[in-house]
Each structure stands twice: as C-alpha cells, then as structure tokens.
Regions:
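Conserved non-catalytic scaffold segment of RNase H-like nuclease domains
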Residues: 2-121, 126-128, 168, 174-181
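Generic detector of well-ordered alpha-helical packing
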Residues: 19-21, 135, 197
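Acidic, Mg2+-coordinating catalytic module of metal-dependent nucleases/exonucleases
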Residues: 97-108, 113, 117-118, 155-213
Length: 213
C-alpha cells in the first residue's frame, strides 16, 4: 500500500517559503532577507499567503546585481517595510504548525536564513528540519532516477545526498524545471518571492506523483 505517500495525505498543511536577500552570501550579518513570502496550501490548493517587506535595526545593503534581479526599490522598501520583530511571530506560527515546509533550494539557501530568524529571537529552528521538503533536491532525484530508501535513510538524509549530487548538464533551477514540465507562468516576474512561490506550488503539484516519499 502507498497510503503513506504525501500525495495521499490530502489533509496535510504545506507551507512554501521563499526569501529575497541583500546578496547571495549566507552569513546572516551580511545577508538579511528584505522580502519573506509564504504560501499555505491544503490538498494542492492555496488557502492563504503572506508577503512581507522587512526592515531591521540596520540599513540594508542590497548588492547591485541582487537589486537588478529582484527589482529591489529603496523607495518602495522604505514605504512598505515593517520591522522584523513584527513579522516573525507569523512566520514562526506558519512554519511551526505546518505539516511540511517546502521551498526550491530551501536546504541549500533559505533554511540558513530561517535559522538566523529563529536564532535572532533566541529560538531553535531544528524542529523544522525533519519536515522540510526541497523541491530542487527532489526533482534532482526524479531526473537521476534515485529513489528514497526508507530502510536506510531518512527523507532529510536523502535530500541532503541529492543536494550534494551533481551531474553535468542536469538543470534543476526553478524556471528551467518548470518549463520542462510545461507549466504556464509569468516567468518574467520571477525573483519576486511570492511569484516564485506560486511557480513552486505549480511544480510541486506536477512532480508529487513521481515521488516515492
């Protein structure tokens, strides 16, 4: 029986999360997320979303390339940003109460930012790890025909193995993979966190039927 598979547990709450940051450095003191977006889903359908523009107790230093790619506007940020301390309780509530936390390259990037968010508030993020699903890792497993082996590895261990597995010519970035799946989307607006998440959800709803978890 396959009733243990995620696709058959339709009542589970999934939270997709994505952050836009100052640059690509993973050290929290040099790379704060200025946009934190989340989409909550049940049975593959969006039931709620949050799109926070965030400010901190120091000025942001968004790199030129990052600003261009993400269309960061200092004027818009100054007008719309709210203090991190105000948005964190919602982020924590959504992530802590989700059955699964998802993102594309979440284990390779966003989880480091989430770790810093929790630690900034004197909290541990470790309880999130075992329920984290990285669609980039999982699609890599699909493409390389590497299935999860529950008798010898956890789902998290399986994903980290895939995170560090490379194959020449294998494309796993969100845009490339989604186009391969024939997903329609406003690709020109990618690198806005909420737009990325909407695509991530579409990809998840396609690839879930190919997963053995």
């Amino acid at each position: 029986m396959d009733d243990h598979l995620i696709r058959f547990n339709k009542d589970k709450t999934l939270v997709f999360i994505d952050c836009e940051t100052e640059n690509l450095c993973l050290h929290h003191s040099h790379n704060l997320p200025w946009q934190v977006a989340m989409i909550k889903t049940v049975n593959g359908k969006k039931v709620a979303e949050k799109n926070f523009i965030v400010k901190y107790d120091r000025d942001l230093h968004v790199g030129e390339m990052a600003a261009r790619i993400t269309r960061f506007s200092p004027t818009s940020h100054a007008k719309n940003a709210v203090p991190f301390e105000q948005i964190f309780p919602t982020v924590q509530d959504w992530l802590d109460n989700a059955d699964y936390v998802l993102g594309h390259n979440i284990l390779g990037f966003d989880m480091y930012l989430i770790k810093s968010m929790y630690e900034r508030q004197g909290l541990s993020y470790q309880h999130l790890m075992e329920k984290t699903l990285d669609t980039m890792c999982l699609v890599r497993g699909i493409k390389m025909n590497l299935e999860h082996k529950p008798e010898s590895e956890t789902v998290l261990e399986y994903q980290y193995k895939l995170l560090h597995t490379r194959k020449k010519g294998l494309k796993t970035n969100l845009q490339a993979v989604s186009k391969e799946y024939g997903i329609e989307h406003n690709y020109e607006m990618l690198h806005d966190a909420i737009v990325d998440l909407e695509l991530n959800l579409k990809l998840w709803n396609k690839m879930i039927y190919q997963l053995s978890i």
